[in-house]
Amino acid sequence: MTDTNVLANSATDNQETTHFGFETVRKDEKVHKVAQVFHSVAAKYDIMNDLMSGGIHRLWKRFTIDCSGARPGQRILDLGGGTGDLTAKFSRIVGEKGHVILADINNSMLNVGRDKLRDSGVVGNVHYVQANAEELPFPDNYFDCITISFCLRNVTDKDKALRSMFRVLKPGGRLLVLEFSKPILEPLSKLYDTYSFHILPKMGQLIANDADSYRYLAESIRMHPDQETLKGMMEEAGFEQTTYYNLTGGIVALHRGYKF
């Protein structure tokens, strides 16, 4: 085999593999592995969110809503919206003339979210769609705002997903990415590592009977692009005036970009 063939085969291998936590897997395999994680945790997802963050995730999401610019009558996509925390808030903001779509690739998460919102009386202006972020099944220039909350790190091809989000946003529309990121203080980073890799899996085992899924959660956070890298990825996808806000010392970051 020639050197050229070796390089070509290597390039093909690189295109076909990605990371699942710290593990290198084929891209199609990651889709199935991530699906298994969220099928497993869906029923206990809200309880674990409160326990893992001490309830602070509610403040992060409230800040996201405040930065969204959502107004009555607008169309909002809550992508990877899971159990519907943001959807419920957007539903009240956009009102009867507005429209919120809760989209998630995982039907278990989508079912939990739909049942929770309907039980809470959130009906009428909310619809549910099972969709892949990389290939959104919506028209061009359709949404006024898209949020993707604690989901992007699980997407296999993040660049493709960002381009897909850009396509379905209206000119003047906003994308907000709320995601775990990189702590900006070294002491906090060390403490967070200890919590993530030693305490979090034990909590997952105790509450959800699933340590492995929460070990993946910790690993997926470490493999996710840092704040500046994600900002650059959004700009490469076409977003402008892209900024980010570090929340809780950078444990979480909110990125916002516009389509013009």
UniProtKB/Swiss-Prot annotation:
Catalytic activity as recorded in UniProt: a 2-demethylmenaquinol + S-adenosyl-L-methionine = a menaquinol + S-adenosyl-L-homocysteine + H(+); a 2-methoxy-6-(all-trans-polyprenyl)benzene-1,4-diol + S-adenosyl-L-methionine = a 5-methoxy-2-methyl-3-(all-trans-polyprenyl)benzene-1,4-diol + S-adenosyl-L-homocysteine + H(+)
Enzyme Commission number(s) of this protein: 2.1.1.163, 2.1.1.201
Superkingdom of origin: Bacteria
Top EC group: transferase
Presence of keyword Methyltransferase: yes
Keywords of this entry: Menaquinone biosynthesis, Methyltransferase, S-adenosyl-L-methionine, Transferase, Ubiquinone biosynthesis
SUPFAM superfamilies in the record: S-adenosyl-L-methionine-dependent methyltransferases
Keyword Endoplasmic reticulum: no
GO MF annotations, alphabetized: 2-methoxy-6-polyprenyl-1,4-benzoquinol methyltransferase activity; demethylmenaquinone methyltransferase activity
InterPro entries: SAM-dependent_MTases_sf (IPR029063), UbiE/COQ5_MeTrFase (IPR004033), UbiE/COQ5_MeTrFase_CS (IPR023576)
UniProt function note: Methyltransferase required for the conversion of demethylmenaquinol (DMKH2) to menaquinol (MKH2) and the conversion of 2-polyprenyl-6-methoxy-1,4-benzoquinol (DDMQH2) to 2-polyprenyl-3-methyl-6-methoxy-1,4-benzoquinol (DMQH2).
HAMAP family: MenG_UbiE_methyltr
Entry's family note: Belongs to the class I-like SAM-binding methyltransferase superfamily. MenG/UbiE family.
Protein name: Ubiquinone/menaquinone biosynthesis C-methyltransferase UbiE
UniProt organism field: Vibrio cholerae serotype O1 (strain ATCC 39315 / El Tor Inaba N16961)
Recorded name of the encoding gene: ubiE
